[in-house]
Amino acid sequence: GLREMETCNGVAMVTDDTQMTIYTAQGLLYAGKKHCDYGNTVREVHKSYLRWIASLLPTEDVFSRYESMYPREELERNELLENGANPGLDKKMCRGGSTFRALLSGQLYSVSNPADEGVRCGTTMRSAPVAIYCYKNPSLAFRLGRDCAAITHGYASAYLAAGVMCMVIARLINGSEMEEAIEESLDYLKTQKDGEELYAVLRKGVDLSRHPSEKPLNDIQTIGLGWRADENLAIAFYCCLRFGRDVKSALLACVNHSGDSDSVAAVCGNMLGAYVGEEGLPSEIVESIQFKELLCQQANSLFSCAVSSLPSSS
């Protein structure tokens, strides 16, 4: 299996997970700049996702499907790609699935108006910026993470998993230990409608980390393959708790299993990054990442404009 970061000409190329994370962050930054209320914050993230999919599918007239919802000229303004910025960010890296279908539907889905499908981890792998934007209020991080995930995924365990992950990261930013952040977030999940299935899967990952076998990959296979959002987050919990601040070992366990390894590693890395900080991350990984400057700039900007509350939409 992998032992070191794979690079191309010294650059560790990102996947669609990072693409969508960047567009999530950009939507939140627009919302912050406009001082949006809660509902319009979700809409700014939705608009950002539409810009993302339009950049990947230039032959599809994505924006015409939303003419009754958003001004076309606003959707067409994509600062991430203006004047040749961030080359490679518009490279299609995934087959589509639930996320593509929802974004091409002409609708804005929500928890109360759910998409027809969507159990997979397209929710968790893109949602970390929500946690930074809402780190001052972990409950708000949960709610906004959930609702931004429901833009594309209609299955409760999928959008709730994004909420749980955002709450964990928000707690970590505030100085909680990993186990404390996870357990408190699981307690919160128990109060949420339709959270029972997700809770059981996440609890399995946590419990396995406390009584691990000699081979992490065996434990990971017991949890699942990570394609589903609930299994994805459960494996990430297991790796974070089993390896603690040993970031490299945790990420190696994520990327060397036979399932959706890049997305599991993305979610695990998001949580560990919040836990150990930049100084605790292996320098050989950090320095080689594609779009590193953009990612750092977005994270710093989100932190600077972070909110403790968002007014309800009128």
PLM features: residue spans?
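Structured, active/binding-site neighborhoods that engage oxygen-rich ligands
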Residues: G1-S314
